[in-house]
Amino acid sequence: HTLENQEKSDYLQAVKCLFESPAKTGIKEPSFLGTASSFVSTKSFSKRSADTLGSDEFSFGTNGVNTTQGTNCVIDGPFANTTLRMDQVYGIDYYDEYCLSREFNQTAFTFANQSYVDECYVKETYNEANFCYVDSPHSCGHLATGGTMENQNASPGDPIFFLHHANLDRLWWDWQLANLSSRLTDMSGQLIPPTFIMEQNRWLTPSAAYLDYDGDAGNDTTLNHVLWMAEIIPNKTIADVMDLRSELLCTEYIVAEK
């Protein structure tokens, strides 16, 4: 299915509406509701996405340029001259305003191409596939777009973030489909990354206030892990969202017509 221009416009206007709506959380809350976004926005994004990069009203805008507002600011498309206020360093309150920015990196684009996706597709376990997808398609999508997307804490400020993560969700579903009977229950991974990763990214170790409700007894992620939905909908578990065909998700990824 290929979206008509009106459908693209409707989607982009809906995103702008979210930008302009009052926040659901206070300034002291996390900058990004990761589980809510990946569960709600990501599951519907690829069905309603507009053309990715372009300067017209039906696209997401192009590369950034230097302006008086900042470096590499996006000045075309529906999100031209967007001002962001999300914290740029995890755990540190940030009250300054800055522009939505992009700085395309062609080398990173190369490392996110189909050949690297294919390498991940043949991995046998979730643990192997997860590390593979995170390493190339995921990280390089952020680095290739650059600017706001390159900053882990601020990256949800670029609407391309949700397009990118929707595609990752699609890739994961494609991987699951290759062996659905076992991969609908294949889950693993640490809840808290190794210390060197925490220090490298200047992340703070979560306190008991964040860990006492997650549903996992130790540091290993299980199907019982609770996904906090920020009161948008009732909290769910990973088990609830493993099957894209379920009544809860009821989602299908459709290949666009060429």
Regions found by a protein language model. Give the residues of each.
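Intrinsically disordered, flexible peripheral segments
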Residues: 1-258
